[in-house]
């Protein structure tokens, strides 16, 4: 009986040590991604790309056009998939950088292959989400400073907001923006995870950064060719146009779909990373 209690204590102690190591590694990875020059460059680059491609549209806007209308137009601009590229910059290339600098083996030895993989995957997803969230809110802030109203009930032009009609054209308009921006950010995080996994196969930074846009386009085209329900198209999901009930339910379900997509590639990345380390 004494041996069993001691054995249980040892397992608990080991678990606590592993968790401390994991949190330390994750803290370091988040610092490398979110608190980095690449993160700032990605946010500012995405904002600049949005306004550079939308400047012609803005020149035709009237003072009474609101943020809902302008934001909706921005979602269909040329090169609108660039948000996937910029979101992948801080985190998706982590493995490429470690592999090229031969830092990966040292990192894996300090913790474990599993902790290394899971930590990189979480940091990649979080940084991609934050790039889109910060950039999109920066866009809205610039438009407000430009003089456009958040919402104009008297505007004759209204956008179809799907499940968000009730909160969009109301005093809770910023809650609408929070929901659709977070949905778009989760989409970016999911495809950044795909890019992170691909980086274990092709350790080329440029291929890694372009991969999310190509995957998004191919998946969307393939689902259309297979005549699958349109509400599951990435193009519909990422814009918050797929309806799964009310605004809250739609947000949770849509973000859950992208989160599940991201988890699949996080697991694949961890396994592929382990094999890459074992085989050199």
What does each model-found stretch correspond to?
Residues 38, 188, 242-280:
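Alpha-helical transmembrane segments of multi-pass membrane transporters/translocases
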Residues 94-130:
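Helix-loop-helix units of permease transmembrane domains in multi-pass membrane transporters
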Residues 42-49, 205-219, 234-237:
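Central hydrophobic cores of alpha-helical transmembrane segments
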Residues 185-221:
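Functionally important transmembrane alpha-helices
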Residues 49-93, 121-200, 237-256:
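Secretory targeting signals
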Residues 3, 9-43:
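Aromatic- and glycine-rich beta-strand/loop motifs that create alpha-glucan
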Residues 37-38, 113-114, 118, 204-209:
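Membrane-helix interface segments
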């Amino acid at each position: 009986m004494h041996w069993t209690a001691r054995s249980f204590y040892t397992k608990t102690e080991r678990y606590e040590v592993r968790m401390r190591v994991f949190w330390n590694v994750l803290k370091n990875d988040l610092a490398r991604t979110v608190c980095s020059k690449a993160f700032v460059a990605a946010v500012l680059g995405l904002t600049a790309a949005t306004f550079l491609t939308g400047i012609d549209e803005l020149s035709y806007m009237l003072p009474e056009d609101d943020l809902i209308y302008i934001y909706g137009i921005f979602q269909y601009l040329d090169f609108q998939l660039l948000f996937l590229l910029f979101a992948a910059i801080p985190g998706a290339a982590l493995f490429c950088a470690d592999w090229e600098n031969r830092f990966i083996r040292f990192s894996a030895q300090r913790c474990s292959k599993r902790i290394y993989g899971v930590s990189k995957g979480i940091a990649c997803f979080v940084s991609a989400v934050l790039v889109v969230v910060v950039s999109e809110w920066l866009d809205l802030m610039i438009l407000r400073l430009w003089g456009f109203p958040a919402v104009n009930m008297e505007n004759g032009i209204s956008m179809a907001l799907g499940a968000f009609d009730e909160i969009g054209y109301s005093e809770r308009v910023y809650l609408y923006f929070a929901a659709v921006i977070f949905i778009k950010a989760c989409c970016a995080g999911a495809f950044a995870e795909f890019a992170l996994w691909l980086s274990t196969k092709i350790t080329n930074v440029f291929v890694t950064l372009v991969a999310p846009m190509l995957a998004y386009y191919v998946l969307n085209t393939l689902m259309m060719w297979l005549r699958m329900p349109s509400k599951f198209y990435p193009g519909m999901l990422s814009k918050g146009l797929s309806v799964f009930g009310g605004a809250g339910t739609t947000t949770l379900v849509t973000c859950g779909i992208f989160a599940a997509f991201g988890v699949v590639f996080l697991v694949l990345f961890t396994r592929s990373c382990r094999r890459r380390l074992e085989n050199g």
